[in-house]
Amino acid sequence: MNYNYLKGKLINYGFPEEVVSINLITKEEMTIEAELYFKIAEVGKKFYDKFNGKSFGIGNDYKLNIIEGKSNKEQEKPKTKEIKYIYSYSAWIYTYYAKKKFEEGLILINPDQKEIQKKMLSHIISKINNTYIKGQDIINFAFPISCYDKRTLLQVFAYELGEAPFILNKVYYLQDPIEKLKTMTTFLISQLYLSVLRIKPLNPILGETYQVKIANLYCYFEQTNINPPTTNFYCFDSDNYYKIYGYVSISTKLGINNLKAIKYGDIYIEFITGNKYKIFYPSYYIGGITIGKRSFCITNSALVLDLTNRLVSYINFQAAKTDKNYDKNPDYFQGKLISIKEIKIDPKGAKHKILEEDTIPLAEFDGEWTRILTFGEKTYWRRKEDNLAKMYEMEYILKSDSSLRKDLILYNENKIEEADKALKDCENMQHNDILLRNKYKKAF
């Protein structure tokens, strides 16, 4: 690929000829892959348009996007293989669940649910002498593999970011802090409707990882603890506009026929513009684990904090339970944007309390977390069947990747007996690893 070829392509792309000449004259001898170069050019074009031609940094963008000292073949590029399963999972919310007024939550109508419940009940009865049934944290409680989702929890976390590239890219270009926070609120809601599970995902093994590309968002997850189950993550977009990072832990309590889950941790979204946000998730309640109607409910409250401007988006998921909103659907929520001086937060994110005397109200909103969010008469988010970004496997992944788990591979091939044995092998390996760690931990 020579200089004239690149120059012609970039002129066709829309760059003024004098700009192309100035910025490419020093790269005449370079040969790089066209696809990558034009991606860099796209970033440079945005800066050129933004500053009316006064600042065009394609040379700088080249240095930012290419690892210096490495050849073209050494650059990590994503595979073109698309992950197709996301489309069937996105259909769950409106094919497997019924939304009815006066119900505690969404009602699962999956025809296979009774069989799954039967297997789970039988397994729990066989373990009745254990302490699991008495309210102990059961996130690592093992069922037969046929009772599980065909994804690990790490893959579920990635799936919940299905709308992130579109929403966060929009936030980057907004100028008004309040409009940014409104759009960040839609980011949280978009994760909630994707968090609805038909059945329990597979527990990640300690040290298990997952790498995936969601549109232009590169995501890396690792299971760093199992008690409580904790996942660290780092995600960034290819334009370096923003990054998502931190950790999330899950605490669950099993009742006789229900499950309560709290998702908490340090979840940050940071933009190159300096804006930084922190998210606090609501709680989850699942009824009908073993008998009766299976229901899924989001409870308590959630927060999106603008740490840069001291603004808060407060979302109340108990709104449908008040007398005023008795006729609302079970997924109804209300919220408000406020300017704040101080905030009191439950360490595990179950209940978020705001000191009212230190707040200034800015806006109110409401919606249904399965389908819509509105500020006044304006709709800021609406669920669509084609909302999700495409997901791709990465070419270079660690051997600890979820997609390489033997039990998961066999399970997806419907080799249930072999998959069940492989799952038990994974659990035994992890159990032995824990014993070994504890032994040497005590030694020091």
Can you say where each PLM-predicted feature lies in the sequence?
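Low-complexity RS/RG/RGG-rich segments used by eukaryotic RNA-binding proteins and nuclear co-regulators
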Residues: 55-76
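N-terminal cationic leader/targeting segments used for protein routing and processing
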Residues: 3, 8-10, 71-74, 78-82
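Generic structural motif
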Residues: 22, 64-66, 219
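Conserved beta-strand elements of beta-rich interaction domains across eukaryotes
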Residues: 1, 27-29, 40-43, 69-72, ...
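Canonical RRM/RBD RNA-binding surface and closely related RRM-like beta-sheet modules
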Residues: 1-61
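Short, flexible coil/linker elements and helix-boundary hinge sites characteristic
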Residues: 1, 14-15, 27, 69, ...
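Extended acidic, Ser/Thr- and Pro-enriched interaction/regulatory segments
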Residues: 77-444
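Short, solvent-exposed polar/charged micro-motifs at secondary-structure junctions
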Residues: 31-35, 74-77, 230
